[in-house]
Swiss-Prot record:
It comes from the Eukaryota. GO terms for cellular component: membrane. Keywords: Membrane, Transmembrane, Transmembrane helix. Disulfide bonds: none annotated. It is found in: Membrane. This is Putative uncharacterized membrane protein YMR173W-A. The chain crosses the membrane at residues 13-33, 35-55, 73-95, 110-130, 152-172, 179-198, 216-236, 241-261, 267-287, 293-313, 340-360, 372-392. Partially overlaps DDR48. It comes from Saccharomyces cerevisiae (strain ATCC 204508 / S288c) (Baker's yeast).
Length: 394
């Protein structure tokens, strides 16, 4: 397998197989596994070259600067700049900000290699991948005044002294399910619950085989002084996954629209176009088929066929994924930011839902700003009832 890195100007790439990977700025990289590309960059920034080290049942990845020798079961990953990595397919991880990853998934095990970009140029992320028999634990850490404490199967705690973001992905694949958790400054959580905070623009796609498919698509943007928290609730049932995102925007942001085209055994992701919006709320619609989950959460999106899903997620996002299988959906979240001004929903299901959308629009016209939160709460409950779900909101 070959990789083609995208580097900055005045960069000289030297790749040597079965040798040593070295990087500039007084840093030496030594990798004792199979392949070792080399990167030299004229400027202070460092571009990472991925090395894919497939073994019999897992694929290891070594992307680095300032990496130390690691055993075969441990991987250290540092991704500071733009990078594109491709490892043949079943699960696709795409980070539209700076990095695009395509990672292969084999049977029960899920190998997930996320990449991070930080607000400052010379901030490095170090990821340690500890694959075990049925799970992969990933613990990245920044190098700027940060203390990272990791407890396997328990809690990931991060303390950052500066206004930098740290993402801690955790992949806990079960027999038929793979869950991904990215966290920043998370608190103690039970083993059956995970919290996902994505402070940068990120798109995740976790594709499952057989009947159950868990798909998490996130596209977020950092707001200057007023970060917005958005809640995504994934409620896996016996043969379906309910994804309920609720979005808020404080300022005119550029949105990424991701179109997921699920086929029988693969998920194709096509991030495209941008939309400028001000204070827009998106209400998703879950369109369940026999073996397929279709989601239509939207603002200003066009009608799509039944096999196409369009998801727009604009802001700081928090994802809670219960690990225990739930047969009964728990409904839509009802927490909406009070500063929302506009609710624009384009739903492609039946006339009933279209009528609900019209009702929501009338609600927003009648009530003033102070009552918008109440309107949205009621609107989502109406959507729940029209879609056949029971709302868990108050």
């Amino acid at each position: 397998m070959t990789t083609t890195p995208t580097t900055t100007t005045h960069m000289v790439l030297i790749t040597t197989i079965h040798m040593v990977l070295t990087t500039m700025i007084h840093m030496a990289l030594t990798t004792m596994i199979h392949m070792a590309p080399t990167t030299m960059i004229h400027m202070a920034l460092t571009t990472m070259i991925p090395t894919v080290l497939p073994t019999r049942r897992r694929a290891l990845m070594v992307l680095t600067m300032t990496i130390r020798t690691a055993p075969a079961t441990t991987m250290t990953l540092t991704v500071p700049t733009t990078m594109t990595l491709t490892v043949p397919t079943t699960m696709t991880l795409t980070v539209p900000t700076m990095t695009t990853l395509t990672v292969r998934q084999t049977r029960i095990r899920a190998l997930t290699v996320p990449t991070m970009t930080i607000l400052m140029a010379l901030t490095m992320m170090i990821h340690m991948v500890l694959p075990t028999r049925r799970r992969v634990l990933m613990v990245p850490a920044t190098t700027i005044r940060m203390v990272l404490t990791t407890m396997i199967h328990m809690v990931l705690t991060t303390m950052i002294h500066m206004a930098l973001t740290t993402m801690i992905p955790t992949v806990l694949p079960t027999r038929r399910r793979a869950l991904m958790v990215l966290t920043m400054t998370i608190r103690t959580a039970p083993a059956t619950t995970m919290t996902l905070t994505v402070p940068t623009m990120t798109t995740l796609t976790v594709r499952q085989t057989r009947i159950r498919a868990l798909t998490v698509l996130l596209a977020t943007m950092i707001l200057t002084d007023l970060p917005i928290t958005t809640t995504l609730t994934v409620l896996p049932t016996r043969r379906r996954v309910l994804m309920v995102p609720t979005m808020t925007i404080l300022m005119a942001l550029t949105m990424m629209i991701h179109m997921v085209l699920p086929t029988r055994r693969r998920v194709l992701m096509v991030p495209a176009t941008t939309i400028r919006m001000v204070l827009t709320t998106m209400i998703p619609t879950v369109l369940l088929t026999k073996r397929r989950v279709l989601m239509v959460p939207t603002t200003m999106i066009h009608t799509a066929p039944a096999t196409t899903m369009t998801l727009t997620v604009p802001t700081m996002t928090t994802l809670t994924v219960p690990l225990i299988e739930t047969r009964t959906p728990m409904g839509l979240p009802t927490t909406v930011h009070p500063t929302m001004m506009t609710l624009m929903v384009h739903l492609i299901e039946a006339v009933v839902i279209n009528t609900v959308v019209t009702t929501i629009t009338k609600f927003l016209d009648v009530f003033d700003k102070k009552n918008i939160l109440l309107c949205l709460d009621l609107s989502m409950k109406i959507l729940c009832m029209s879609c056949g779900y029971v709302s868990a909101g108050k």
